[in-house]
Amino acid sequence: MALKLGVIGTGAIGQDHIRRCSKTLVGSQVVAVTDINLEQAAKVVRDLDLGAEVYADGHALIAAPDVEAVLVCSWGPSHEEYVLAAIAAGKPVFCEKPLAVTAEGCRHIVEAEIASGRRLVQVGFMRPYDQGYRALKAAIDSGQIGEPLMLHCAHRNPSVGENYKTDMAITDTLIHELNVLRWLLDDDYVSVQVVFPRKTSKALAHLKDPQIVMLETVKGTRIDVEVFVNCQYGYDIQCEVVGETGIARLPEPSQVQLRSEAKLSNAILMDWKDRFIAAYDVELQDFIDGVKGGTLYGPSAWDGYAAAVAADACVLAQNTGAVVPITLAMRPVFYS
């Protein structure tokens, strides 16, 4: 029987998730939607021929008796409110990042979920579902390269809009690395420093770009992440793990290699959706299957909280230039 989903937020990512849940994935049916713009929500229902009901707000949708699980895809500052409401209603909830806009908000969600007695929350970090990252983790976990000593990473975008600010290099961009690198290493961060190289002429006046974020983990692994959001040439994600006896590298997306006009070339993707579209599909299918099977396995509320704590420290490091400690409480047994 199909899992009946209610979707809060019908912007770009909400529409993508509605489309994949209703047209691509198996075992789910979108029966309810809402958005701050109700006309847009109604248009999405018509355009995708959903037959879903449009609710006045997220709380009404969560309370609807035919909604069995909730997808929160709305404006970031509304996430905490709706996730807490879903937990209170005893309904599983998939929340796009951020889980909440503050670490304190994430902690409230963690506490509410623990009090509920079962895992109800999955956070929309999709990189652990990417085939390349999974292959990289398998190589690390196999012991083929010994213990990881250093990671060299890069997160590059061709360009960003004028509303993109310097701290968004952490909260919107690096946040993916903050999650996936913890997962890759099965380790937590203890400190961070951010330095600013020579600024690119392609960045707007208010934006410092590129940035280099240097992290240290509990086990002593050192990580450097280049965040360069005006690189011009493409959307490029890199991750190299230097171990005691070898090096493992994130594979490039599969692209046709072209020999033509005295050149050997591979295309570079220009958009994050193209790079990770398959991971989004696997991620949401895992949520659907987990809810139906009674156990969620994807990124947890604790993972969302850990990323938020690290992000807060990174922003402080941006502003001070100092090495900033990252203090994370011990992981509750509930999330072991």
Swiss-Prot record:
GO BP of this protein: inositol catabolic process
Source organism, top-level taxon: Bacteria
Keyword list, A-Z: NAD, Oxidoreductase
Catalytic reactions on record: myo-inositol + NAD(+) = scyllo-inosose + NADH + H(+)
Enzyme Commission code: 1.1.1.18
InterPro entries: Gfo-Idh-MocA_inositol_DH (IPR050424), Gfo/Idh/MocA-like_OxRdtase_C (IPR004104), Gfo/Idh/MocA-like_OxRdtase_N (IPR000683), MI/DCI_dehydrogenase (IPR023794), NAD(P)-bd_dom_sf (IPR036291)
Pfam entry (one): GFO_IDH_MocA_C
GO molecular function, one term: nucleotide binding
Claim: Oxidoreductase is one of the keywords in the record: yes
Subunit description: Homotetramer.
Similarity comment: family membership: Belongs to the Gfo/Idh/MocA family.
Biological role stated in the UniProt entry: Involved in the oxidation of myo-inositol (MI) to 2-keto-myo-inositol (2KMI or 2-inosose).
Name of protein: Inositol 2-dehydrogenase
Organism: Pseudomonas syringae pv. syringae (strain B728a)
Phylogenetic classification of the source organism: Bacteria, Pseudomonadati, Pseudomonadota, Gammaproteobacteria, Pseudomonadales
Gene this chain is encoded by: iolG
